[in-house]
A protein has these predicted regions:
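Short loop/turn motifs that connect adjacent beta-strands in outer-membrane beta-barrel proteins
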Residues: 19-26, 68-79, 104-107, 152-166, ...
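One-face residue pattern on beta-strands with alternating periodicity enriched for small/polar residues
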Residues: 61-67, 81-83, 100-102, 109-113, ...
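Extracytoplasmic loops and strand-loop junctions of Gram-negative outer membrane beta-barrel proteins
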Residues: 46-50, 83, 127-131, 181-186, ...
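Sequence/structural signature of outer-membrane beta-barrel proteins
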Residues: 36-38, 83-89, 115-133, 154, ...
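Exposed, low-structure sequence patches enriched in small/polar residues
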Residues: 212-221, 227-495
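Bacterial Sec-dependent N-terminal signal peptides
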Residues: 1-24, 493-495
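Beta-barrel outer-membrane channel/assembly domains of diderm bacteria
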Residues: 18-117, 127, 135, 141-152, ...
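Internal, well-ordered domain-core segments that constitute the primary functional module
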Residues: 118-234
């Protein structure tokens, strides 16, 4: 609770700068319940909801949050929030979903704490997309200290033809105790793991002069430091690996570098920690009230797929978004094709572990998995695209992605018939091959679909209710049919 106390103090703190008179408190109270058949709830009733929804067929939660917004003089601003939640059949009975303070000057922000952040820096339709390949909204927020320019900032002298945005963050994974409880006998888990991410994205174009924009950039993230344990038959654990946690490790995370003699051999010939990322590209075309956007989200692990070392890129997510002029029927349409099947090929050979010391083959990337940190996950949910089901779905207590070689098609469509009503439909079809090291017994297929309607009554300002129907059919996660109802109340507490 120390973090929440710190946030409360920030509410009461008086900045050195002279203040404006206006300030605003906003509250949010929300409750949600899910009931379904099958072993698991339908995927799209769970995924991309910041870890708030459980994979279990019957679950629910209640959350309450308060935000404070304070504009100051000379372009300064403070935003802070505290969001608490409790649930039934969740990974925790009670948890702090958000506790943060943002200090902003013009377009530059220093954010401290745990905060729900949409995928960055590549923008996608958050209501319709299947997710982001490297990091998205599929898991609970990771507490961090983060400097960022969230929106594109024009570079002086370019007449607004060139702009950039980006971020730099260090944080800590808070799911160590969850991993220990979830982990099965003889399985491995990690605690006290640190987090690092950074991004830089450019936009070329000025839509006021030419109706075309091109975006390109890079996102990188790393798990580093921490300790690895193995669960024993008597319920105790033994430490297997003690990763370094000094200042040098923070530098190695920022600038991917081979580890020293205090790291396992695998880190000494590759890079220290679990380094991953994505190349991001976007192409926008504007025609009157129409907008067409194409995106490419290319995922990589270490260096093998970062460039064209093993041929042209075969893995990633290709997307097309179409935004229609305002009408009563359809607002947006989306299609995405996703592939993680190649993974740089099946061969991983580190010469120091074999007979040919001068031979190095860096294939078999084993996406989202790692031999020290187990998996790119937080509280059991994958940090990347949720069509690759996270460790929370593993009934044997293993913290890994059992199928990270997949091909999928995903579609979405949404509409806003009026100010009171909105709806969306999303559907995915995926084929799973398992892992190179442990392939599935056969190619397994899975369909995941969801229809959701939200009502925002004008006669009850601040209230909304959402009803969703989810349907899963297949032989990977199995069959499931279920519904979810979410009731929400938001409002202000004065200025």
């Amino acid at each position: 609770m120390n973090l929440s106390k710190s946030i409360l103090l920030l509410f009461l703190a008086t900045p050195v700068l002279a203040q404006e008179n206006s300030q605003e408190f906003q509250y949010r109270v929300e409750m949600s319940g899910t009931v379904s058949t099958g072993t698991y709830a339908p995927l799209w009733l769970t995924a991309n909801r910041f870890g708030m929804e459980s994979e279990k067929p019957k679950s629910g939660y209640l959350r309450a949050g308060l935000e404070w917004h304070k504009p100051l003089r000379k372009g300064w601003r403070i935003d802070a929030g505290l969001d608490l939640a409790g649930g039934v059949k969740q990974t925790s009975d009670f948890w702090i979903q958000q506790a943060y303070a943002d200090f902003s000057w013009k377009m530059l922000t220093l954010s401290v704490g745990s905060k729900e952040r949409m995928g960055f820096p590549l923008e996608k339709n958050s209501e319709l997309t299947s997710g982001w390949m490297a990091e998205g909204p599929n898991m609970r927020p990771i507490p961090q200290i983060r400097g960022e320019i969230k929106d594109y900032l024009s570079i002086p002298g370019t007449r607004q033809w060139l702009a950039f945005k980006g971020h730099l963050a260090y944080g800590i994974f808070t799911d160590g105790h969850w991993q220990e409880d979830f982990c099965g006998v003889n399985q491995k888990y990690a605690k006290k793991v640190m987090y690092h991410s950074k991004s830089l994205m450019f936009r070329l174009g000025n839509k006021e002069k030419l109706p075309v924009e091109f975006e390109f950039g890079l996102f990188m993230a790393t798990q580093f430091s921490g300790d690895q344990y193995q669960k024993l038959a008597d319920g105790s654990s033994k430490q297997i690996t003690d990763m370094p946690d000094g200042l040098k490790s923070y530098w190695h995370a920022f600038f991917p570098t081979a580890g020293g003699s205090d790291t396992p051999e695998g880190e000494q010939v590759n890079v220290e920690g679990n380094m991953l990322g994505s190349w991001n590209f976007g192409l926008n075309f504007y025609a009157g009230d129409w907008k067409i956007r194409a995106t490419l989200d290319h995922y990589f692990e270490d260096h093998s797929q970062m460039f064209w070392e093993y041929g042209r890129w075969k893995d990633g997510q290709l997307g097309i978004e179409v935004y229609l002029p305002k009408n009563k029927w359809v607002s947006a349409v989306l299609w995405e094709g996703i592939s993680t099947k190649d993974s740089s090929g099946p061969i991983l050979y580190d010469g120091f572990w074999g007979s040919f010391s001068d031979l190095q083959m860096s294939g078999g990337d084993d996406y989202y998995n790692h031999y020290i940190y187990q998996a790119w996950q937080h509280y059991g949910q994958g940090i990347g695209n949720p069509l690759l089901a996270g460790p929370v779905y593993n009934q044997d207590g293993s913290i890994c992605f059992k199928s990270n070689r997949m091909k999928a098609q995903h579609v979405g469509i949404s509409g806003n018939p009026s100010e009171e009503w909105k709806w969306r439909l999303i559907a995915s079809y995926a084929r799973h091959w398992g892992r190179y090291s442990s392939p599935l017994d056969k190619v397994r297929k899975q369909f995941n679909g969801m229809a959701e309607v939200t009502y925002l009554p004008q006669w009850a300002k601040g209230w909304s209710v959402s009803a969703a129907l989810g349907i899963d059919r297949g032989n990977y996660l199995g069959n499931s049919t279920g519904g979810m109802i979410t009731l929400r109340k938001t409002g202000g507490l004065g200025k």
